[in-house]
């Protein structure tokens, strides 16, 4: 597994820094899958599992993977003009409907026979491009969706279920929005792994559980507040609750630190509070899990994701969205170290086993099927 991680990091350096694109091989029997991608860490996290398992795909299903930055595709500067069986593409979340359609048509003109998948890496659960893309794609891939698919037909204040909740909670004036799902779209909607399956987290999950009996920090919660009005008020409320604990608990909540120091703090923390961001699923959720810090987070039971890492009372501690039970649960789990470690260990081992057993290779089969890339057993 370590070799696959280093291959990914070398790939990132070659594509991002050197601007070199590796052509597909000339082996006629191999199928070809091309990822057209945006340049952002969250975007790259969505495709990492595929490139991590690239050799498995070649061996088990006989197809190759290549990555083409979206900017290079738009400029027609790439070596992928030949036949391609599947194209998976990303865009930024604020692309206009007309621009998205133009891009989709360009992909179709370039590879007329390819099956197309859209990779929605966006933080919120909404499916804003479903209706636009439905006639053109074989699959719509996202790292989290609402468990109740019927909720997608409900109008929201703002763009998402989170903007809706916090606009109502804080009395904010946001326009009503509805991203209706086309009939039958649910069959195209597929899940991809969340942030746990990334090159900077995976190595930690492959190590033994980081048990530490004498963690010195009671609560870790470095919370950024600046952002859009609903986000700022939501995060400020969370920060204020954490700051109230400073007089009686040892808390890390103020300012920014580098990644190494940040992880060092988490390895030394009993509890980690991870409020929502612009979406529910956050990097911090899994950083808490691989450091053995017990995750406290607003209730995630409304979401689907895989691996299914948010199991109430088993892999994390759910909080009310208004955080009315925050102080009570902080006090309880600080006073019950055995229960705290049990839940933290469960979370770590659930993800560790997912990676060790290479379950992604099974979970991805519905997507491969839709793209015509699966080799029949």
Q: What is each PLM-predicted segment?
A:
Residues 1-7:
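Boundary detector for helix-to-coil junctions that initiate low-complexity/charged tails
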Residues 264-376:
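Catalytic binding pocket for nucleotide-activated donors in carbohydrate/polymer assembly enzymes
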């Amino acid at each position: 597994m370590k070799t696959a991680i280093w291959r990914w990091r070398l790939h990132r350096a070659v594509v991002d820094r050197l601007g070199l694109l590796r052509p597909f091989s000339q082996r006629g029997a191999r199928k070809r899958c091309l990822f057209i991608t945006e340049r952002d860490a969250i975007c790259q996290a969505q495709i990492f599992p595929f490139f991590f398992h690239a050799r498995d795909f070649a061996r088990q299903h006989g197809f190759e993977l290549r990555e083409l930055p979206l900017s290079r595709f738009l400029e027609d500067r790439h070596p992928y003009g030949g036949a391609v069986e599947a194209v998976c593409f990303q865009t930024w979340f604020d692309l206009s409907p007309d621009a998205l359609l133009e891009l989709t048509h360009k992909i179709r003109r370039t590879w007329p026979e390819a099956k197309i998948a859209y990779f929605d890496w966006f933080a919120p659960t909404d499916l804003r491009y479903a209706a636009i893309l439905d006639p053109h794609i074989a699959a719509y891939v996202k790292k989290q969706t609402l468990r109740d698919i019927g909720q997608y037909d409900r109008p929201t204040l703002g763009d998402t279920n989170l903007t809706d909740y916090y606009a109502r909670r804080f009395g904010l004036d946001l326009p009503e929005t509805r991203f209706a799902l086309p009939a039958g779209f649910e069959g195209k909607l597929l899940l991809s792994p969340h942030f746990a399956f990334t090159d900077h987290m995976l190595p930690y999950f492959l190590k033994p559980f980081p048990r530490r009996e004498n963690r010195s920090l009671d609560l870790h919660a470095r919370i950024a507040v600046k952002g859009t009005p609903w986000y700022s008020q939501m995060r400020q409320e969370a920060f204020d609750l954490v700051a109230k604990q400073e007089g009686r608990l040892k808390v890390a909540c103020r300012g920014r630190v580098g990644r190494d120091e940040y992880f060092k703090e988490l390895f030394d923390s009993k509890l980690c509070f991870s409020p929502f961001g612009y979406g529910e699923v956050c990097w911090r959720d899994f950083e808490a899990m691989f450091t053995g810090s017990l995750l406290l987070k607003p209730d995630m039971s409304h979401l689907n994701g895989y691996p299914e890492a948010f199991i109430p009372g088993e892999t994390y501690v759910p909080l009310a969205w208004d955080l009315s039970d925050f102080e009570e649960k902080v006090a309880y789990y600080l006073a019950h170290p055995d229960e705290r470690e049990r839940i933290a260990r469960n979370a770590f081992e659930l993800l560790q086993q997912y990676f060790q057993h290479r379950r992604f290779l099974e979970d991805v089969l519905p997507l491969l099927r839709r793209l015509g890339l699966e080799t029949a057993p």
